[in-house]
């Protein structure tokens, strides 16, 4: 990145810093002036320093028009970048009316980005807090909390401390971005009482910096040096020119890559493969940004195998994108024989496509739909002539087997570099041989949940002694990914092979700049800190007395219709200006918000750190003092995959639903599949069947549903499929139906009126009748055998009569049970819910040692 473009980017990142100052001091002055005064104390007297101050001081039209600046002053670029990022012109500057009224309210907190997304709802707000991995999550709430002057003063002191250590003009672009993110992510950009305060100051300044860098690159390529003419005098006309380029990338083959494993060491391998994909995509993004001479300010979104980057629409940029895609895919073919593929699409767009205020001539383009179509087209013709020639040439580097090469026992790729698989079970009698990639992925899964190893480095060549390094595709060929210690980083930097660093969950501090990568690395551990394996997770189901079927729960879930919602969510057709909220900063804020939920907040939900007013959900008794016995295998983008003790996983799933509803203000829903399996069953088959359950839930009208393990008797008795649920026997419910009807009504009724061994069987009370497991089985089988609203009432009545107690004091309770069972049995939906409730009860009553 050239010095001038870098300066424009930093000016964009700092242009509104005065908003913090004005809210911290309550001075009656424009925020642009206060911001320039604040930053001045950290600068020298060079021309670059003076230029930065002019950008901050004159980024509004009123001041800029009378400043008498040269036509090539960057202040004109920042002015236009600010307008485009905010999505409108003629905005009042904070501080304009401080002496005339209460138009700006510095007490306002950040609104939830979902307040104006896809329909009306009661607004929710975020408290003013920093972004910290060690603290509890900042959930939105319905109360308009107050952002205090003292809180803003604290933010101001934090920036002052950092800027005194290193001047902002001397910082790397990504370093400055990180400082702003830490403190400004929950600070509202605007406190104008006539506007929605749903864009954070961080998101707005980030997008302003990104837009400024794009404008500078575009003008440089076209030889434009009259910034005043392009960005100020004739900016309205130029907003209809396709200056910008939205770049989207998407990994294909993710499912096949993740689940192509053996049962030995399955948990670590799953976690390692999922994390590898995350870092591989982050590395691709950094390779692309480096080739485009841009920073992470231009990264709109990166998670779940997808990314969006805002760049300049020039031939140079489009050629660079094609070149990066080609080189990355060459590396992926070499490493994984085409299992993974990166599809990239580009869509030119103009400033008016990014702004709320378009003129009447311009027809606004739906950016994300258009670029998604380009990505889909790229997937239809994967490779260019160079890669195809290699693939079809049996003597090429891709196809030629080295002398002595053998097939890897995990991925089945032939190589001459095999060694014992690190996931081999001791004393198992088999020695699986694995390639360096598969063994490296196993080590990566182990390192991911090691609290002492939170930094991962990409090296340009394999360092001496780094046996656990994994090859990763890059523009320069293959690079190497490995967990790192501070000493390692220093050694590799001195050797000149350290390319970049990724910091897991923001816990790394050093002189080396690292990109933060939020990871939901929750894993249940035993008393000595060892991560539970599949068998131990299944064993931890139920209670500690041996009750509760020993089964592993598997959950797969993703957001319902997120793609369509993302495309249309900010478009309100009933409004005079339907696209008033469809601004670049809002899409960036929405993307960041979703990524933060699935990569960071999900970990807090696993730890039962829930919004105020939401208590952890339990199927049976409360386990408030115990952590959830679950593992996050993968969580990112808009989907997740977890395994765990089946009852704990069910509790987590309901917690997730409730928290997601709060987080998105009820605007988005998700559907899930949850299956129960023997811990020795094939993990790839578990994932496949649970994925089918997830699809079944999504096929329910309105989606917003959960599909549970099969409800047929063969589920209990047929062990040939490892206890896997058959899709046709699954029970599908909306979340409200499951929470309120299955659990809130049926399960609770059974627990309150029956003595159930393993649940409440030790409670000898005359308001509960004894009910054995075999009798409950017979009742459940009769209910399952009914068709529609037709029921064999005679057989049902006979079986139900077996519950009738001899003791008179239990008669009233029996009559309640009999009456309620009849009511539920004759109605199809009620009967289905009762069957599911009985299933859960029976699973909880079964002994762990039962098959």
Summary of predicted features, one role per range:
Residues 312, 327, 674-678, 688-700, ...:
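Cyclic nucleotide signaling catalytic output domains
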């Amino acid at each position: 990145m050239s010095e001038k473009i870098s300066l424009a980017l930093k000016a964009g990142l700092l242009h509104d810093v005065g908003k913090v100052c004005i809210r911290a001091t309550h001075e009656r002055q424009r925020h642009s002036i206060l911001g320039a005064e604040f930053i001045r104390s950290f600068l020298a007297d060079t021309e670059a320093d003076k230029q930065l101050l002019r950008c901050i001081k004159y980024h509004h039209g009123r001041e800029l028009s009378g400043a008498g600046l040269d036509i090539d002053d960057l202040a004109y670029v920042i002015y236009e970048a600010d307008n485009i990022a905010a999505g409108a012109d003629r905005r009042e500057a904070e501080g304009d009316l401080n002496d005339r009224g209460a138009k700006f309210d510095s007490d306002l907190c950040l609104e939830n980005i979902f307040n104006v997304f896809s329909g009306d709802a009661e607004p929710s707000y975020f408290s003013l807090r920093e972004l910290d991995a060690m603290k509890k999550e900042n959930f939105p709430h319905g109360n308009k909390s107050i952002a205090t002057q003292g809180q803003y003063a604290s933010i101001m002191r934090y920036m002052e401390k950092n800027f005194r250590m290193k001047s902002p003009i001397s910082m790397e672009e990504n370093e400055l971005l990180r400082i702003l993110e830490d403190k400004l992510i929950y600070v509202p950009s605007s406190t104008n009482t006539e506007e929605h305060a749903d864009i954070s100051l961080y998101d707005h300044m980030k997008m302003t910096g990104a837009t400024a860098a794009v404008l500078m690159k575009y003008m440089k390529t076209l030889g434009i040096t009259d910034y005043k003419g392009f960005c100020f005098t004739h900016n309205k006309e130029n907003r209809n020119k396709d200056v910008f380029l939205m770049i989207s990338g998407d990994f294909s083959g993710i499912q096949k890559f993740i689940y192509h494993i053996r049962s030995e060491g399955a948990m670590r391998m799953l976690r390692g493969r999922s994390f590898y994909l995350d870092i591989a995509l982050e590395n691709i993004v950094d390779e692309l940004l480096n080739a485009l001479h841009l920073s992470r300010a231009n990264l709109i979104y990166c998670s779940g195998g997808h990314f969006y980057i805002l760049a300049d629409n020039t031939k140079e940029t489009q050629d660079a994108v094609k070149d990066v895609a080609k080189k990355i895919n060459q590396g992926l073919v070499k490493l994984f024989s085409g299992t993974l593929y990166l599809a990239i699409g580009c869509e030119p767009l103009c400033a008016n496509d990014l702004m709320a205020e378009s003129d009447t001539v311009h027809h606004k383009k739906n950016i994300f739909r258009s670029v998604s179509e380009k990505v889909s087209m790229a997937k239809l013709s994967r490779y260019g002539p160079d890669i195809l020639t290699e693939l079809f040439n049996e003597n090429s580097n891709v196809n030629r087997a080295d002398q002595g090469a053998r097939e890897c026992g995990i991925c089945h790729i032939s190589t001459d570099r095999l060694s014992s698989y690190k996931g081999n079970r001791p004393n198992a009698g088999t020695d699986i041989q694995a390639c360096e990639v598969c063994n490296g992925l196993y080590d990566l899964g182990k390192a991911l949940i090691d609290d002492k190893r939170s930094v991962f480095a990409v090296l340009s060549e394999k360092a001496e002694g780094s046996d656990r390094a994994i090859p990763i595709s890059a523009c320069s060929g293959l690079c190497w990914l490995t967990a790192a210690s501070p000493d390692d980083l220093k050694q590799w930097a001195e050797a000149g092979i350290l390319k970049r660093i990724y910091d897991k969950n923001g816990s790394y501090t050093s002189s080396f700049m690292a990109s933060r990568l939020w990871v939901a690395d929750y894993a249940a551990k035993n008393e000595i800190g060892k991560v539970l394996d599949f068998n131990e997770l299944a064993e931890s189901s139920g209670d500690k007395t041996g009750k509760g079927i020993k089964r592993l729960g598997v959950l797969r879930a993703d957001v319902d219709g997120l793609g369509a919602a993302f495309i249309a969510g900010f478009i309100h057709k009933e409004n005079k200006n339907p696209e008033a909220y469809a601004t670049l900063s809002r899409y960036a804020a929405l993307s960041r918000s979703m990524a933060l939920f699935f990569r960071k907040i999900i970990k807090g939900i696993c730890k039962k750190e829930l919004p105020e007013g939401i208590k952890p959900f339990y199927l049976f008794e409360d386990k408030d003092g115990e952590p959830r016995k679950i593992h996050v295998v993968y969580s990112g983008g808009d989907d997740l995959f977890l395994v765990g003790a089946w009852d704990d996983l069910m509790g987590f799933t309901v917690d997730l639903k409730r928290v997601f509803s709060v987080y998105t203000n009820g605007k988005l829903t998700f559907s899930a599949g949850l299956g129960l399996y023997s811990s020795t069953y094939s993990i790839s088959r578990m994932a496949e069947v649970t994925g089918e359950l997830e699809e079944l839930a999504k096929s329910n009208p309105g989606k917003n549903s959960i599909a549970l393990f099969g409800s047929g008797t063969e589920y209990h008795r047929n062990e040939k499929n490892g206890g896997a649920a058959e899709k046709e026997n699954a029970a599908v419910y909306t979340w409200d139906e499951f929470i309120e009807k299955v659990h809130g009504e049926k399960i609770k009724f059974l627990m309150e009126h029956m003595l159930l061994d393993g649940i409440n069987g030790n409670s000898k009370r005359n308001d509960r009748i004894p009910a054995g497991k075999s009798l409950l089985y017979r009742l459940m089988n009769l209910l399952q055998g009914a068709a529609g609203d037709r029921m064999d009432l005679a057989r049902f009545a006979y079986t139900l009569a077996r519950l009738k107690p001899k003791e008179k004091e239990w008669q009233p309770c029996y009559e309640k049970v009999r009456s309620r069972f009849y009511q539920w049995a004759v109605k199809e939906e009620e009967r289905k819910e009762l069957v599911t409730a009985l299933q859960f009860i029976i699973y909880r009553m079964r002994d762990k040692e039962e098959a």
